[in-house]
Amino acid sequence: METSWKNALANEFEKPYFESLVRFLHEEKAAGQKIYPPGSQIFNAFDLTPLQQLKVVILGQDPYHGPGQAHGLSFSVPEGITAPPSLKNIFKEIESDLGIKMSGYPNLENWAKQGVLLLNAVLTVRAGAAASHSKIGWEQFTDAVIRYVSDNCEGVVFLLWGNFARTKKELIDATRHHVLEAAHPSPLARGAFFGCRHFSKTNELLLAQGKAPIDWKL
């Protein structure tokens, strides 16, 4: 994990729940279970978005569980993998909101490198089994991440899409940060994601703070 995050979260790594979580992952591997993303990419979101560069948080639920999809960034898949339906809808909203044409390139690393923390609440999953690693400790860890950002950063824009992400609102100090809410971009979700205009709104909020806007185009 990137140094600024490792230092910020040092206390979490020492806690019994995290030791239990690591033990669980070792036991899964020992039992022959395939885990996504690969071990080197579990903390990819932190590695690509150092704490001092953080401007935006996009919160997802848990990693994609299909072969080759998960690479440690919420909603993102590596190049060469077809964009999942939620990501396609995100691109449609960007096109509508910003009046630009997206290439369909599904790897969101360029956003991460500009200060967008693409954080899943759960950072691993068993192959082919959605939400199989929920309730093993990851939520406690990523809640601590959100709390740390809330307490130690200023003016971060949190994009909370869907009912699960919205439950994290209580961890965020809305007097110091900006919280934008919408329905989940999944085609199966109820409510309005289209028309939320979160991408232009995020940039307006960043510019108002004298921060560089995010180039959302891919």
Each model region followed by its residue ranges:
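A polyanion-binding, active-site-adjacent surface
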Residues: E2, N11-L160, F164-T167, I172-D173, ...
